[in-house]
Amino acid sequence: MPTKAELEATITELEHKIRRLDRSLNQTRIDLAELPTAAYNRFETPHLNDNVREALTRASAEWEADVKDPSERINLYIKSCHGIGWSWEADYVKNGQIAWCGAFAAWCHTRVKFDIRKKIFPSCYRMYQAWGQTSRKIDPMKVQPGDIVVVYAAKRSIQGDHITVCVDNSDFGSDGFITTIEGNAHGTFPDGSYGEGVIKRERKLTEFAHVYRLVADDFDEQ
């Protein structure tokens, strides 16, 4: 058992360490205050261009429309020229009849050239083949609203398993999440209930397979 003198010496040493830590903490606070905001707030919401704003507006409108699977409205994503334009498909009347997550993303990004929406948006595989080796594939840590985020499901396919649209990255970080609006998925409806259709949910970085950001040449001229 330590003596009284030894304990007093330990207390004195700890008090010195606390004072040194206080000085270091105060200096760090001063240094932080002098930095521009952008130097440490790396997840600040960026300026959104018109194409991205339009996609986010359309995504939110579909979510607020409370589209539950199956729904006649899903035919618009699949068959109309504002979605993927697969007009030859049979009417969607049964849950699981076709995987339509990419068709929903195409509906949101309707300003993208029709040929791209028709040929690339319909599946994770098509996106990976067309964009996986291009500048559209970005660092997942740089995800922004409007980006197409392909996530893993149980299969964890190399191309990813499900297509989503990022609508908010304000809570993102290595331990945080983004908010997505998705079609053909389970999540939250506008009234807070849980179900399948056009839903909103949170996705963590560990779920990301690939993040794609469309480039200017992908859009129709306005």
Report each predicted region and the residues it spans:
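Active-site signature of cysteine proteases
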Residues: S170-Q222
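N-terminal amphipathic/basic helix or basic patch
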Residues: E6-A9, E13-H16, D50, E54-T57
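N-terminal capping segments
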Residues: I30-V112
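Short, highly selective alpha-helical patches that border small-molecule cofactor pockets
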Residues: L7, G102-A105, T164
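...with weaker cross-activation on analogous glycine-rich loops/strands in unrelated enzymes
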Residues: D115-P190
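Short intrinsically disordered terminal tails
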Residues: M1-P2, V143, F219-Q222
